[in-house]
Amino acid sequence: MRFTKMEALGNDFVVLDGIRQRLHLTPETIRTLADRRRGVGCDQLLIAEPPAHIAADVRYRIFNADGTEVEHCGNGVRCLARFLVDEGLAAPGVLRIETDGRITEAEPRDDGQVSVDMGPPELEPARIPFQAPVRQEAYRLATSRGEQTIGAVSMGNPHAVLRVDDMTGAPVAELGPEIERHPRFPRRVNVGFMEVCTRDRIRLRVFERGVGETPACGTGACAAVVAGRLRDWLDAPVTVELTGGVLVIHWLGPGRSVWMTGPARTVFRGEIELPASAAATPRGPTR
């Protein structure tokens, strides 16, 4: 099976073409592909497929390294947009990418950056999903380290955002996995630890659901800026400094789309031998 290895700010992906071929992948196969010793190695696996929605150019699916499917990935959608153009699967320009019932617009640029309309954030607790009686700008969450104040935001996937004084010393390893599986988040949650440096710059670490801490998380950066803007800590746009690099996030307020701009690049292409049950077969015309 042919694959493309890509990265965005150190968040790495195995990308598969499911447009020209049908892929038959089990969770076990996905875990093997993601394994850095037995497979290719990645934080997440991305599959490009023919769209189900007539308004979309392509559909993509996202799988964590543990084999679970998730709703959205900001760094992943930038890599996918770059992959589609580089592989000749889409013409340069604005691409309409379908995932989990929503369509995201992405535009690969000549300078290596990709701008993405991530859509408006979801703030209603039931739709995040998060267990709370009413919508608030901040919530109190009981943890083993005492009550924590969080922002709860969905960017197509759920995020909890905590403000910390110093990103470097943030309790990511301790609170990340605990909050990820907190019972008030029924589908688990990504956890961001945000240091506000100025009104237009933050530093951020993210413990990703089903993955652990990663060098960067695009939806996490969007969620952090939304949470910070709702608390009047930030202006627009905001430069987000992550371990893997920098994203620029622009959000003008409730009901408006969040725009994310950042890099995406191909690292290498290759082939891997997989069990016969995971074989790819040619796909006929889709439209």
From Swiss-Prot:
This is Diaminopimelate epimerase. One of its GO terms (biological process) is lysine biosynthetic process via diaminopimelate. Catalyzes the stereoinversion of LL-2,6-diaminopimelate (L,L-DAP) to meso-diaminopimelate (meso-DAP), a precursor of L-lysine and an essential component of the bacterial peptidoglycan. The record marks F268 as: Important for dimerization. The record marks H159, E208 as: Could be important to modulate the pK values of the two catalytic cysteine residues. It comes from the Bacteria. Homodimer. Keywords: Amino-acid biosynthesis, Cytoplasm, Isomerase, Lysine biosynthesis. GO terms for cellular component: cytosol. SUPFAM superfamilies: Diaminopimelate epimerase-like (SSF54506). InterPro entries: DAP_epimerase_AS, DAP_epimerase_DapF. Belongs to the diaminopimelate epimerase family. It is found in: Cytoplasm. One of its GO terms (molecular function) is diaminopimelate epimerase activity. It comes from Halorhodospira halophila (strain DSM 244 / SL1). The active site is at C73, C217.
